[in-house]
């Protein structure tokens, strides 16, 4: 009997691509064939084939920040992308499509509707993006990571890597720690400039009390090392973190942005967090962070309010007992079966 096939529509950022890979891998274990639809100039083009998943491409890009010519050309570009996606769907003959966000999802979702293929949509953020708001009107089923994106959609969490759920619980990790508090600063693949410029001034005042690791992002090691100056020996600086599970396990508290995937990873491992949301006009990252801050698992510091003095005052008053309680609260908010649940819904609607 022929294997069932899923077409994944996701691209642009790790927040869209990594959860989609987790779902794809879950279905691959159940003997599903997977095909991916993306764009050639975004991260999925290099990343997805590394997981042994074939990828095909359509031409589409975002409009934010583009000039008037691009806006005038947009209807033609979208129409062309829909036709490209429709042709690929007719060739691949998937039993279902999974939309996980990114520019590619819009035209590909419309094409799937035209081809009569079930559309399962997953919104990773606490507030839905424009593409998913529109696709939500034609999707067969809508799922969401947080309870605030769609009024009636099932909340399943964000699929995150299995190794994060396999870590020891916070009370076990914290049980034999008596040395300095450990602070992990995570800027993401591009780094977070505000963290890179603020933390060196914080370490100047707290190097004798706290231990720091700082992931600074692509190409930023030299600049940030200079900012740390004579305190550089007090900090472990890296461009990327290859083993996030080990880094989270090491930390007592994590300072980071609050992208959807990051928030769900923090919950999965059970870690105390200080979130500095990126300043989207739709407050997307702030609302993601509230999911944990509302239960006392995290502190939110708005970027406009972030100063070295403020961060120093907050950090120096933390105790390991406080942080353990925050970590335990974060763990209660995790949804370890997110990838499995999304896979179940796909199977349900593909029959």
Swiss-Prot record:
InterPro entries: GlcNAc_MurG (IPR006009), Glyco_trans_28_C (IPR007235), GlycoTrans_28_N (IPR004276). It comes from the Bacteria. It is a peripheral membrane protein. Keywords: Cell cycle, Cell division, Cell inner membrane, Cell membrane, Cell shape, Cell wall biogenesis/degradation, Glycosyltransferase, Membrane, Peptidoglycan synthesis, Transferase. One of its GO terms (biological process) is lipid glycosylation. One of its GO terms (molecular function) is undecaprenyldiphospho-muramoylpentapeptide beta-N-acetylglucosaminyltransferase activity. Its EC number is 2.4.1.227. UDP-N-acetyl-alpha-D-glucosamine binds at residues 13-15, 125, 161, 189, 241, 260-265, 285. NCBIfam families: murG. Cell wall formation. Catalyzes the transfer of a GlcNAc subunit on undecaprenyl-pyrophosphoryl-MurNAc-pentapeptide (lipid intermediate I) to form undecaprenyl-pyrophosphoryl-MurNAc-(pentapeptide)GlcNAc (lipid intermediate II). Belongs to the glycosyltransferase 28 family. MurG subfamily. This is UDP-N-acetylglucosamine--N-acetylmuramyl-(pentapeptide) pyrophosphoryl-undecaprenol N-acetylglucosamine transferase. It comes from Haemophilus influenzae (strain PittGG). The gene is murG.
């Amino acid at each position: 009997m022929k294997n069932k096939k899923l077409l994944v529509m996701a691209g642009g950022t790790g927040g869209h691509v990594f959860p989609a890979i987790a779902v794809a891998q879950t279905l691959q274990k159940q003997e599903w064939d997977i095909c991916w639809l993306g764009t050639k100039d975004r991260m999925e083009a290099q990343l997805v084939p590394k997981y042994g998943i074939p990828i095909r491409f359509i031409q589409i890009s975002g409009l934010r920040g583009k000039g008037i010519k691009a806006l005038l050309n947009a209807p033609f570009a979208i129409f062309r992308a829909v036709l490209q996606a429709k042709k690929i769907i007719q060739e691949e003959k998937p039993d279902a499509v999974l939309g996980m966000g990114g520019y590619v999802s819009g035209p590909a979702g419309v094409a799937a509707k035209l081809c009569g293929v079930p559309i399962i949509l997953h919104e990773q953020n606490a507030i839905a993006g424009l593409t998913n708001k529109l696709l939500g009107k034609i999707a067969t089923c809508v799922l969401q990571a947080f309870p605030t994106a769609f009024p009636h959609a099932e909340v399943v969490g964000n699929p995150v890597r299995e190794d994060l759920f396999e870590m020891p619980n916070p009370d076990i990790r914290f049980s034999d720690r008596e040395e300095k508090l450990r602070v992990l600063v995570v800027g993401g693949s591009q780094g977070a400039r505000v963290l890179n410029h603020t933390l060196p001034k914080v370490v100047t005042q707290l190097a004798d009390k706290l231990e720091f690791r700082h992931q600074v992002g692509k190409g930023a090691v030299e600049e940030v090392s200079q900012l740390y100056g004579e305190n550089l020996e007090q900090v472990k600086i890296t461009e990327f973190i290859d083993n996030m599970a080990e880094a989270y396990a090491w930390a007592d508290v994590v300072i980071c942005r609050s992208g959807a995937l990051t928030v769900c990873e923090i919950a999965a491992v059970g870690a105390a967090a200080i979130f500095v949301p990126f300043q989207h006009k739709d407050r997307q990252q702030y609302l993601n962070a509230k999911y944990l801050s509302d239960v006392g698992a995290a502190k939110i510091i708005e970027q406009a309010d972030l100063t070295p003095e403020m961060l120093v005052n907050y950090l120096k008053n933390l105790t390991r007992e406080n942080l353990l309680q925050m970590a335990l609260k974060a763990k209660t908010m995790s949804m370890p079966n997110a990838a499995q649940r999304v896979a179940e819904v796909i199977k349900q609607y593909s029959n």
